[in-house]
Amino acid sequence: MFKVFSQVAFQKVCVGAILSGSFLAGLVSDARAQQTGEARSVFAADYQKKLAAVVGSNNEVQWTIGIRDIHDVQHLSDGHWLLQTSFGNVVEVDAEGKEVWRYEAGKTERGGPIEIHAFRRLENGLTMIAESGAARIIEVDRDKKIVHSIPLSVPNPDAHRDTRLVRPTPNGNYLVAHEALGVAREYDRTGKTVWEYNVGSKLYSAVRLKNGNTLIGTGDGHRVIEVSPEKEILWQIQEKELAGVQLAWITMVDRLENGNTWIVNCHAGPENPQVLEVTPGKKVVWSFKDFDRFGNALPVAIPYQR
């Protein structure tokens, strides 16, 4: 069971637990996060401080879990969390932090390493897991049986660099951010490439929007781009285009219901916010910065609602 703390307990304890001999502990400050704009609750995870936490709209920590590495998260409709504590697993925990399901990565057919950098609980109850090193997407049931497997086109598989985020599309395909290849690629369920866009940098994320365009977090490309099905850039934010903000390694991106864009700005240093909300007109209307609890390696952040 994970250690999950209330705000009172959080201020008194050292966060961490022992998980398969590799869980790391760290003392976490009770200093307040800095938010600009309308305050909101945020799930954020940083592998420098070894911490995943929900920070409330009052900037107080609601709960926390110790981690080693993390590149993805999903808040499920029943209040559970699908996350990871290392690149070798996917873990589901309930709202109290109790582990209810776990998937551990194995080895490739040749005995090589496999890392996990993306996962999703699907509407049919299966769990999608992208296996880097094995160069495939698998869908597994609660018993961890592979129900479906999709091969990915990766010339030289690399456990750490094959993929970053993978997201399902409305038509049942998968949109894959291939970090090493610098390509966002859509695969059908047989593994056939049906669309791709050459980003030209170590991209982290690609999300298919309701309008059919694709929103891409370009990683070390230091920008966010929205491209059409015809591969035309329709909207973008460049590295130094936002007033008072420099974009660094762009990880998670999403289009919010209000039409604004969610941007996670990793490795940007304490002079810059770690998370931003930006209007179509490129105005920053909300930001989050916390270099006390978190560090300069915060790739994962999503809005949080109970």
What label would you give each PLM region?
Residues 1, 33-34:
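Initiator methionine at the very start of the polypeptide chain
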Residues 34-306:
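Histidine-/acidic-rich catalytic cores in large beta-rich domains
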Residues 1-10:
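N-terminal secretory signal peptides that target proteins for export/translocation
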Residues 5-6, 20, 24, 182:
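Generic secretory/membrane-interface signal
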Residues 27-33:
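Sec/Tat signal peptide C-region and signal peptidase I cleavage site
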Residues 12-26:
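Bacterial N-terminal signal peptides
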